[in-house]
């Protein structure tokens, strides 16, 4: 028991020391290049409040939803090996139907067209 306590104290102390060093070390060496913002090779001269296309935002959110669908359906082959995979299949089909209905709605509302 005493070994566990000593190990926890040493780990906590080392973690605290490393975090403190990480906060103090960058403040010792301030360079103009490090203190200025970097925007993909361009100097930020204009305003940061530039308008963006709402169509681009909606298409990005749609792709994000379908990436989430893939992440949710990836464990499906392992779930099919359960003794009773009926509930898993029903939930997977419900998810696919819900996302297909959402995609059809976006398509009908012309939300996927890029022209403005």
UniProtKB/Swiss-Prot annotation:
It is an enzyme of class 7 (translocase). It catalyses: a ubiquinone + NADH + 5 H(+)(in) = a ubiquinol + NAD(+) + 4 H(+)(out). The keyword Transmembrane helix applies. GO terms for cellular component: mitochondrial inner membrane; NADH dehydrogenase complex. Pfam families: Oxidored_q4. It is found in: Mitochondrion inner membrane. Its EC number is 7.1.1.2. GO terms for molecular function: NADH dehydrogenase (ubiquinone) activity. The keyword Cytoplasm does not apply. The chain crosses the membrane at residues 4-24, 56-76, 88-108. One of its GO terms (biological process) is mitochondrial electron transport, NADH to ubiquinone. Keywords: Electron transport, Membrane, Mitochondrion, Mitochondrion inner membrane, NAD, Respiratory chain, Translocase, Transmembrane, Transmembrane helix, Transport, Ubiquinone. Its main location: mitochondrion. It is a multi-pass membrane protein. Belongs to the complex I subunit 3 family. Core subunit of respiratory chain NADH dehydrogenase (Complex I) which is composed of 45 different subunits. Interacts with TMEM186. Interacts with TMEM242. Core subunit of the mitochondrial membrane respiratory chain NADH dehydrogenase (Complex I) which catalyzes electron transfer from NADH through the respiratory chain, using ubiquinone as an electron acceptor. Essential for the catalytic activity of complex I. This is NADH-ubiquinone oxidoreductase chain 3. It comes from Osphranter robustus (Wallaroo).
């Amino acid at each position: 028991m005493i070994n566990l306590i000593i190990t926890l104290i040493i780990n906590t102390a080392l973690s605290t020391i490393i975090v403190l060093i990480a906060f103090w070390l960058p403040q010792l060496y301030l360079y103009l290049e490090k203190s200025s913002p970097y925007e993909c090779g361009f100097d930020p001269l204009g305003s940061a409040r530039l308008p963006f296309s709402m169509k681009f935002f909606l298409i990005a959110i749609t792709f994000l939803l379908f990436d989430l669908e893939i992440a949710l359906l990836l464990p499906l082959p392992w779930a099919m090996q359960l003794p009773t995979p009926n509930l898993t299949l029903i939930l997977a089909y419900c998810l696919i139907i819900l996302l297909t209905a959402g995609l059809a709605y976006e398509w009908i509302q012309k939300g996927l067209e890029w022209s403005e």
